[in-house]
UniProtKB/Swiss-Prot annotation:
This is Vacuolar protein sorting/targeting protein PEP1. It holds the Pfam family Sortilin_C. Belongs to the VPS10-related sortilin family. CDD domains: Sialidase_non-viral (cd15482). It is a single-pass type I membrane protein. Residues 22-1391 are lumenal. Keywords: Glycoprotein, Golgi apparatus, Membrane, Protein transport, Receptor, Repeat, Signal, Transmembrane, Transmembrane helix, Transport. The gene is PEP1. Residues 1-21 form the signal peptide.
Length: 1577
């Protein structure tokens, strides 16, 4: 009985706590408040504070009751706890001026701190106090001031306290004040940068060098680091603000400032002070805030070393940089600025340094082809643990109604050994295995994915973690499908807690957990509830709330996680003016009948499964999961026990600086890192021994392992102190060939797309330094199209009907399905003004491409390819014409070339509603059409296999293009549109089409593209229609062409082509051969020495021979510079026999720089020039930093490679180049890329005045030594003068100035239509022709009433000359037919007004004469007294002033007439006397003698026409890079009875755009040259 009673009692003792636990309900207290969103806890206390509206409230009982604080008089903007004095100090910032409130006793009392008054015209936008970790009295107050904006209402002037203030945020200043007496007094740390009138924002950012009580930095307690910056709002030419900066150190509270010498000539973008390091980030280009950045690291605030970065750092997030327990620097970075607003500011990559902080590398498994957002979480209390998530940026969109494609896979992984090894987050939950869509035992394909691990789980626990996420393979992530999971082993394994996402918090070191669903309806109950667990998440209990709230935060009231009291803050939208907050205080402190755990309730939990981490084994004592007690060690931190490991292993080591880990994890030498280090500077030997491993800094393992040295080759490694030492090379090896590449043309970064021989796409955002494979979901990429109007957009076509589009340079892609039609390989056509609008061409009824029913269909999309609509059947090429013209007749106009299935002809149709209701046939039969520079040109077949061209500048009015009737021009069978610029079209008209013997004439149009004149004859052309024609980029009117010098014999098939190179400096009006250099690159004279350029000149290989048509002679950013491969002699030699030549003055003078053919590339606007041998293996490049004066060789790789191409960004403004090469390896060849970075070889960035004024580094100067006029003006260009600085992102080519406009000379004119340039330089009419009918202009412009005859000359459109020769002076005006009346009215005068004026004048003269006669002559005796009157006579009647005036007139008249009469008489007498003498002396001579002088203008000989040319010019483009060949069969040609319409070259009044996308060449070709001739009359 006694035994039974004992068993019963024992059972009761065990059961009662369980019953109490099941019946336990936490104490919940509710408080209702307005607009309260953040609650703060004082550490190790029961005191909480929060901001409510504009006041501060406080609770001294863990949130159960609240009261308004006393002592704060102002409205408060925000409050915060002092991070170094979390137990008792908080700060509240005032809304008014420079005032703050501070408490040092947990909010019981508050002291007002007033900062020094600001200037009268500015006002504070808020202040923030930073405190010192070691001295409680040290303050740094940071304030922001902005100029006040004028307001009309005096009541709102902001002068009175409480009045609203309007700030001008474009004129703001930061100020920093320091105090060493607890805020009683402050002194300003004044910026050492002078703020000028252009500085919009002035930034001062100061911080104590000590950032924690455990700081390892060598600094004093009073050391303060300050960064001062001035930012200027830049004019339109720039893409970003200009920044100047100074980084300084002060130890005397700002009285003296010491600038860091290493950053004097750099732009410091930001800095971060960590426990062991100070990190400084410098901006590579002060004129581009998106430029790449460098990271500098110091551990003594004195010596900084530049860290090695595996990729470009462009958008750092300095505020997120931190240091882990090993002293490694964690550097989050955003590598892009997405076009998608929601993507901005999100971390896209995380780099981790070695323990020295000098070599960064990405998290290994994130450096793959999937690019996305990265999130890294390191719980500080779990040493060595890292949880990282990668969320792919690829966005996939599909046609409505179609199944979704597979997304790029995201992944979440965990490491418990500081990132040495990683595993997925395993879900070990057999009870819920059926609730998941995948097999949770297949960890690699079914694991927990958490895209953003929140900091809510940062409360210290013994390995107990919670998170939200979904279980799967990472291919699908829908935020609405998230669930809540829990782990008890530090994150290695997880189990399901809730089927919905929750906010959560832990207490009592993880023994109490509170979770609240984001959505109250998750349990089909509209009322909110929270759940709690007292057994570390094993079981959960629901607590119902009476109100529906949106949870804002749930938190433990003790930040160290030791307490068992929580705060739940939620809100409802109760009224329009704000929110109503419900604050719940939840108390679990009496759980388990208030029992405290005893020793046997605890167990040991080992971190990292008991393995050594950083040379130490860690363990934590934690409560057993089912123990019926709470730890109740409130305000005590969680204890972590450690035991040093005896032996060091490879896990305790990292690769030395000169080594990197290969695919197997072994540390191998890296040539680039060897160059950056100094290991080879210490030896003269070819090799040096270096240990590949180094012990991790701070590792605590006891016995180091033996590390054997590895011999590193120092052959070719530059020595310290040389510029070559600073060149950085990155090599990438591939087992395939790159067949296509193209850069995105932006300054944001150096992004490019590459396609390999397997049809796989690769993307790089750092100029090829790091390359990622694009996941096309198994589809081969068969075509890539870049949007020519939107530089960040490109489209990739998949082999299975997908289209992958990017609008952010390849950072993210959207996938859509193309219409269910056969891909025909036709390019997309884009709308120039709508990024998401384009036309795709697919084949319909095309089971076979040869099927008779197979035809093309144009599909239109307005949403970037998400949906397509069928626009037009049988369309093979369309243009959004309305978006191309400057003044379109209709902005929605679309033109399409249509080829009907049943017809062999093609027609041109247009529509203004995408062919829904409107369809207009423009031409019934065409060969093809193209758009260029604001024109659309249509090729129309004519009789006898000829072509005619029609041009429009508005899409409605078409005019026939009239070609000149030169004697050597037969049929118009083929022509190539070369380019259009400055209102003219350049066109090549083929005159000989025999394959291999092609050539023709170079023509130029008037402003509306309808009247052409011949510029040069026998210009070289190839069979594909490409022409040796190139306009020099960035300069006005300079063109290079190759002519066939023996064209007559070539046409007769007697000789092969002999090419010569010619150049023009006035847009084709005059041509000369290239002047050869006197000596070659070795200082020797050229064998060809004739003074005649016709016999000895420089010749260059041109456009028709290029492997890549993007490799132009010149660069638009390197003004005046050109490279070319050629020779000096009578004719052009084969390519292999040529040398490489260079010019800096636009082609006036040349120099040989290499004896063999080389490839070239421009960088930094010509500030860095690079050459690499062509068609021969090499391991070196040549580069120049002084505009080609001197050249240096640099070895960029260990073994020789055959360089296929060298390239850089399209604007040639970068300092980074990309080489594509192929090298022979064992077992075959490998394709390689080399990224060569020259950023560090320059001492500094050139100092540039953003207003375009001259500075110490930039001066205005003419392009060449000559200063004569070109295009009617003298121009100077802003050019760099110092070779030791780099230019950067300055549009230098846009800064030029015209010194003056010159008088017009012969060089400012070209021949008009039907005129040609004769040998004497004059323009003469073509024999047998008449000038164009000038009256035709009246037909084209009905409003005209007059026209003028042509003089034979027309002024070059680019010329701005004034005065001087007027060779284009018009004739007298002629009346337009039918406008004779208007013409007569314009130039004739009406008889009525003329008669009135004439009679009026006669009447006035008659009256005056009668008055003088009556008062002065008749009254004084009449004409009879004329002979008696003498000057001064007193006999005249003078009764008043009128009489005296009249008498004076009479006397003066008499005097004048008397003298004239005497003079005539005397002259008559003398002449008679002389004649008499002559007759007497020469009486035998008969008849007169005559001479005549005809005065006329004359012109210089042709050789003198170019004398004195100034090479200054401005902004021309290269010609187009894509040919469109249009062929016509015999059946295509209809018989046309109409003859040519009459024509005039007078331009229309319509303005025409003068811009043309560079790099395009269009060819309209009629290959049939055997048809009979049809002479045009």
């Amino acid at each position: 009985m006694i035994l039974l009673h004992f068993v019963y009692s024992l059972w009761a003792l065990l059961l009662i706590p369980l019953i109490n636990a099941e019946e336990f309900t936490p104490k919940v207290t509710k408080t209702i408040a307005q607009d309260s969103f953040e609650i703060l806890s004082f550490d190790d206390s029961n005191t909480l504070i929060r901001k409510q509206d504009a006041s501060v409230t406080i609770s001294f009982d863990d949130g159960e009751t609240w009261e308004k604080v006393e002592g704060i008089e102002d409205e408060i903007t925000w409050i915060y706890i002092d991070p170094f004095n979390r137990h008792d100090r908080a700060v509240a910032t005032s809304m008014y001026e420079s005032r703050l409130y501070i408490t040092n006793d947990q909010g019981k009392s508050w002291e007002r701190i007033t900062l020094p008054d600001s200037e009268k015209n500015i006002s504070s936008r808020g202040c923030y106090i930073e405190t010192h970790p070691l001295n409680k009295n040290y303050f740094l107050a940071k304030c922001n001031y902005c100029e006040k904006t004028e307001v009309d209402n005096e009541e709102n002037s902001g002068d009175e306290e409480g009045a609203p203030v309007i700030f001008n945020i474009t004129r703001c200043t930061d100020k920093v004040f320091a105090s060493n007496d607890g805020g009683k007094s402050f002194s300003e740390i004044k910026s050492s940068l002078e703020r000028n009138e252009n500085s919009a924002i002035s930034i001062s950012d100061c911080g104590f060098a000590k950032t924690g009580k455990d700081s390892d930095l060598e600094s004093s307690d009073t050391s303060i680091i300050c960064l001062f910056q001035n930012m200027q709002l830049i004019m339109d030419e720039f893409s970003s603000p200009y920044t100047e900066s100074k980084l300084v150190l002060t130890t005397d509270w700002g009285k003296s400032l010491k600038e860091f010498d290493q950053f004097k000539d750099k732009v410091v973008n930001g800095y971060r002070i960590l426990k062991s390091h100070m990190v400084v980030i410098t901006q590579g280009d002060r004129y581009n805030d998106m430029s790449s950045m460098d990271v500098w690291v110091s551990n003594d605030l004195s010596n900084f070393k530049m860290a090695y970065m595996p990729t470009q750092l462009r958008h750092s997030m300095q505020g997120e940089i931190y240091e882990d327990a090993m002293g490694r620097i964690i550097l989050p970075m955003s590598r892009e600025r997405s076009d998608q607003e929601e993507d901005k500011g999100i971390v896209s990559e995380i780099l981790i340094s070695d323990s020295q902080g000098l070599k960064f590398s990405p998290i290994p498994w994130t450096a793959n082809e999937v690019f996305g957002y990265i999130n890294l979480y390191q719980p500080t209390y779990l040493k060595g643990t890292m949880i990282a998530s990668l969320y792919p940026l690829s966005r996939r969109r599909n046609r409505k109604g179609k199944a979704k494609g597979v997304k790029n896979k995201g992944v979440t992984k965990i490491s418990v050994d500081n990132g040495l090894t990683w595993t997925v987050l395993k879900v070990v939950d057999p009870d819920n295995a059926d609730s998941f869509d995948c097999d949770i035992t297949d960890f690699e394909n079914c694991s927990l994915q958490n895209m953003f691990y929140t900091r809510e789980g940062s409360t210290p626990t013994a390995g107990i973690l919670m998170t939200t996420g979904i279980v799967g393979d990472g291919s699908v992530f829908d935020w609405g499908d998230q669930r809540t999971f829990i782990s008890r082993d530090g994150g290695l394994t997880w189990k399901l807690a809730f089927d919905f996402p929750c906010l959560y918090a832990v207490g009592d070191y993880g023994n109490v957990i509170v979770a609240i669903p984001y959505n109250a309806d998750e349990d089909d109950d509209p009322q909110s509830e929270f759940y709690y667990s007292l057994d570390q998440g094993k079981t959960w209990t629901e607590y119902q709330l009476e109100t529906t709230i949106y949870p804002n935060e749930v938190m433990n009231t003790t930040p160290d996680g030791s307490g068992a009291k929580f705060i739940l803050n939620g809100f409802t939208l109760a009224h329009m003016d704000g929110t109503t907050n419900f604050i719940y205080a939840i108390d679990f402190s009496t759980a388990f009948n208030d029992k405290t755990c005893e020793e046997n309730d605890f167990e040991d939990w080992n971190l990292a499964e008991g393995k050594c981490v950083n040379g130490v084994k860690y363990k934590i004592r934690r409560r057993k999961q089912d123990a019926q007690c709470l730890v109740k060690k409130v305000f005590e931190d969680l204890q972590l026990f450690e035991t040093a490991c005896d032996k060091c292993t490879e896990a305790d080591y990292e690769c030395a600086f000169e080594f990197v880990r290969d695919a197997t994890g072994k540390c191998v030498p890296d040539y680039n890192l060897i160059v950056l280090s100094d290991v080879c500077d210490k030896t003269k030997k070819k090799t040096v021994p270096v240990k590949p491993l180094q012990l991790v800094k701070g590792d605590k393992c006891k016995k180091p392992m033996t590390v054997k040295s590895v011999d590193i080759s120092c052959e070719g490694v530059p020595k310290k102190g040389t510029n070559d030492k600073e060149i950085v090379v990155t090599e990438n090896k591939f087992d395939f060939k790159i067949q296509f590449y193209q850069y995105f043309d932006t300054v944001t970064d150096e992004s490019l797309l590459m396609i390999n021989s397997r049809g796989e796409a690769y993307i790089s955002h750092d100029g090829g330094q790091t390359i990622r494979r694009f996941d096309s979901n198994g589809e081969t990429i068969i075509e890539v199209v870049f949007n020519p109007y939107y530089n960040s957009s490109a489209y990739l076509f998949g082999s299975k009907g997908s289209i992958f589009s990017t609008h952010d340079r390849g950072y993210s892609f959207m996938t859509a399905k193309l219409p269910e039609a056969r891909q025909l390989g036709m390019p997309l056509d884009f709308n120039a003004k709508a990024q998401d609008t384009f036309i795709y061409y697919g084949g319909k009824n095309c089971e076979s491409i040869l099927s008779p029913e197979c035809h093309a269909v144009a599909y239109l999309t307005n949403d970037g390819g998400e949906t397509f609509t069928e626009m037009l059947d049988n369309a093979i090429h369309c243009e959004f014409a309305g978006s191309l013209f400057k003044y379109p007749s209709n902005e929605d106009m679309v033109m399409c070339q249509v080829k009907e299935k049943s017809s062999q002809t093609r027609s041109l149709v247009s529509s203004t509603d995408f062919f829904q209701d409107d369809k207009n046939t423009v031409f019934e039969n065409i060969i093809g059409y193209l758009s260029t520079g604001g024109y659309i040109i249509v090729a129309v077949p004519h009789e006898n296999n000829e072509l005619r061209a029609y041009v429009t500048i508005d899409g409605t009015e078409f005019a026939e293009a009239k070609f000149p009737y030169d004697e050597d021009v037969g049929k118009q069978e083929a022509f190539t549109i070369l380019e259009s610029e400055k209102g003219s079209i350049f066109l090549h008209l083929a005159t000989n089409l025999v394959p291999g013997r092609d050539f023709g004439n170079l023509l130029k149009s008037n402003s509306n593209g309808t009247s052409f004149v011949t510029l040069e004859h026998a210009v070289n052309r190839n069979t594909f229609g490409y022409v040796d024609f190139e306009k020099i980029q960035g300069l006005e009117g300079i063109i290079l062409t190759n002519i066939v010098s023996n064209s007559d014999k070539v046409a007769e098939n007697k000789e092969d082509k002999q090419l010569k190179t010619k150049i023009t400096f006035n847009e084709g009006s005059d041509w000369n051969f290239l002047k050869p250099p006197k000596r070659d690159s070795e200082g020797k004279k050229f064998s060809c020495s004739s003074k005649s350029l016709d016999e000895c000149s420089l010749h260059l290989h041109g456009y028709t021979e290029r492997k890549d048509i993007r490799d132009t002679y010149s660069s638009g950013s390197a003004l005046g510079m050109m490279f070319g491969v050629g020779n000096v002699g009578p004719n052009l030699l084969p390519y292999k026999e040529c040398s490489t030549f260079f010019t800096t003055d636009g082609g006036e003078t040349w120099a040989e720089v290499k004896k063999t053919p080389h490839q070239w590339e421009y960088g930094d606007h010509g500030g860095i020039l690079v050459l690499v041998p062509e068609n021969s293996e090499t391991d070196s490049i040549s580069y120049s930093t002084d505009f080609g004066k001197t050249w240096k060789d640099y070895k960029f790789c260990a073994d020789k490679v055959l360089v296929k191409d060298i390239t850089t960004v399209p604007r040639d403004s970068a300092l980074r180049f990309l080489l594509f090469g192929e090298a022979a390896d064992i077992g075959g060849s490998s394709f390689r890329t080399y990224t060569i970075d020259f950023r560090n070889i320059f001492e500094r960035q050139c100092d540039f005045d953003i207003t375009g004024k001259e500075s110490a580094d930039y001066k205005y100067s003419p392009l060449s030594s000559k200063s004569n006029c070109l295009f009617g003006h003298q121009t100077e260009f802003l050019r760099k003068t110092d070779e030791n600085c780099f230019i950067g992102n300055i549009p230098l080519s846009e800064f030029s100035r015209n010194i003056k406009n010159c008088s017009c000379t012969r060089q400012d004119f070209e021949c008009d239509y039907n005129f040609y340039k004769a040998n004497d330089g004059t323009c003469k009419l073509v024999k047998g022709l008449s000038p164009a009918n000038a009256a035709d202009v009246c037909k084209k412009e009905p409003d005209l009433i007059e026209y003028f005859e042509s003089s034979g000359y027309r002024k070059i459109p680019l010329s701005t000359c004034e005065g001087g020769l007027k060779l284009d002076a018009p004739s007298s005006p002629h009346a337009c037919p039918g406008k004779e009346k208007e013409f007569k009215e314009k130039y004739s005068v009406s008889a009525g007004p003329f008669a009135f004026i004439f009679i009026s004048i006669l009447l006035i003269i008659f009256f005056a004469a009668w008055f003088v006669y009556d008062r002065g002559i008749r009254r004084n005796g009449g004409f009879a007294r004329f002979g008696e009157i003498r000057l001064g006579d007193d006999g005249l009647i003078e009764n008043n002033n009128t009489d005296r005036v009249v008498n004076n007139i009479v006397k003066s008249g008499f005097y004048v007439f008397s003298n004239i009469g005497s003079l005539l008489q005397h002259t008559k007498t003398n002449i008679a006397h002389v004649i008499s003498k002559i007759r007497g002396r020469f009486g035998n001579r008969t008849g007169p003698s005559y001479s005549s002088l005809i005065h006329d203008q004359f012109l210089d000989e042709a050789d003198d026409l170019l004398a004195g040319h100034d090479e200054d010019a401005n902004d021309l483009s290269s010609f187009m890079d894509q040919g469109s060949n249009f062929e016509i069969e015999e059946d295509d040609v209809p018989t046309l009875e109409e003859e040519h319409t009459s024509y005039t070259d007078q331009p229309t009044t319509t303005d025409v755009p003068d811009a043309l996308p560079e790099g395009n060449e269009e060819n309209i070709d009629r290959p049939d040259s055997t048809a009979p001739s049809n002479e045009n009359q």
